[in-house]
């Protein structure tokens, strides 16, 4: 039993060392900064396109505002009045644009999804690109089905709330608990779909589940931590005043992308077990605290019996 525990511990240590080196190699923080910048430029166009898709269906009249309020309340922690007001103002201003401007909005939103596609495929070391028609179909599916699924879940929630069965105290308590888990379920589903569908290679479901669960937990913890920071240390609003919405939103988007990419790194590294399993690696690499996996090759060569190595 003790030997199995030690072996599991060494396996875990080997994996975390490999994951650390992988994250450093992929320059995760730099990629997250790039994605945050692209997202900040494409956020309003993307939301506008999503809301315009909903507005094309009479049954979804008024759904845009419902989805917008739900996203701001549950996925932007402690959104100050400045952030919420600025987002709504930016989105409302797009209604004054011409057809040409609307076309540019669509292009900007596709550019964001394309950037996500490139970043995740780089993490999975995918060099083969998808066919243009397949990529366009995938992007179009995200732009159309995404808001419809969110609205459908919110509509189902509203319908259940209106039922007489909700008058029962036990059922009502259970429903409120379930409703509280809805944002977590949606974020986990989004991470899972992202890690399964975007990479242009076959991903094992259990690896994607671990990555999505890790990213989901980090996301929920980050929401609480970021909300506490914004409310307890409102330095951005003191320094920037009315412009505080921009840096606050950028920092949160940057943090979100770090979480997304960490989840992707976890999912991808689980599929590369041949590089971190203890049986495949020189075990004395774990004796030193600051030793990294790449040093094991040098240690092996120095101990070689090959005359050329001496």
From Swiss-Prot:
It comes from the Bacteria. One of its GO terms (cellular component) is plasma membrane. Its main location: membrane. It is a multi-pass membrane protein. The chain crosses the membrane at residues 34-54, 97-117, 136-156, 178-198, 207-227, 242-262. It is found in: Cell inner membrane. Keywords: Cell inner membrane, Cell membrane, Membrane, Transmembrane, Transmembrane helix. NCBIfam families: PRK01637.1, yihY_not_rbn. Belongs to the UPF0761 family. This is UPF0761 membrane protein VSAL_I2938.
């Amino acid at each position: 039993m003790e030997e199995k525990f030690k072996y599991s511990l060494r396996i875990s240590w080997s994996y975390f060392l490999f994951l650390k080196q992988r994250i450093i190699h992929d320059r995760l923080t730099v990629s997250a900064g790039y994605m945050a910048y692209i997202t900040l430029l494409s956020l309003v166009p993307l939301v506008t396109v999503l809301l315009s898709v909903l507005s094309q269906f009479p049954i979804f009249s008024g759904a845009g505002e419902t989805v917008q309020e739900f996203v701001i309340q549950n996925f932007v922690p402690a959104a100050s009045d400045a952030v919420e007001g600025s987002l709504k103002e930016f989105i409302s201003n797009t209604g004054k644009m011409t057809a040409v401007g609307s076309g540019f909005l669509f292009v900007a939103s596709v550019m964001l999804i394309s950037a996500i596609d490139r970043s995740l495929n780089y993490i999975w070391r995918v060099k083969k690109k998808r066919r243009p028609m397949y990529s366009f179909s995938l992007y179009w599916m995200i732009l159309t089905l995404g808001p419809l699924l969110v609205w459908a879940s919110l509509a189902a929630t509203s319908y259940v709330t209106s039922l007489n069965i909700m008058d029962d105290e036990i059922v009502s308590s259970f429903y409120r608990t379930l409703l509280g888990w809805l944002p977590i379920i949606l974020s986990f589903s989004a991470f899972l779909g992202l890690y399964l569908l975007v990479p242009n290679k076959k991903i094992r479901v259990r690896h994607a589940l671990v990555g999505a669960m890790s990213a989901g937990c980090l996301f929920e913890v980050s929401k609480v931590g970021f909300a506490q920071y914004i409310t307890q240390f409102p330095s951005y609003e003191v320094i920037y005043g009315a412009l505080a919405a921009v840096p606050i939103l950028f920092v949160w988007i940057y943090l979100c992308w770090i979480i997304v990419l960490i989840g992707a790194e976890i999912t991808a590294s689980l599929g590369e077990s041949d590089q971190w399993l203890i049986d495949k690696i020189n075990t004395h690499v774990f004796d030193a605290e600051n030793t990294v996996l790449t040093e094991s090759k040098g240690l092996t060569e120095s101990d070689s019996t090959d005359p050329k190595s001496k």
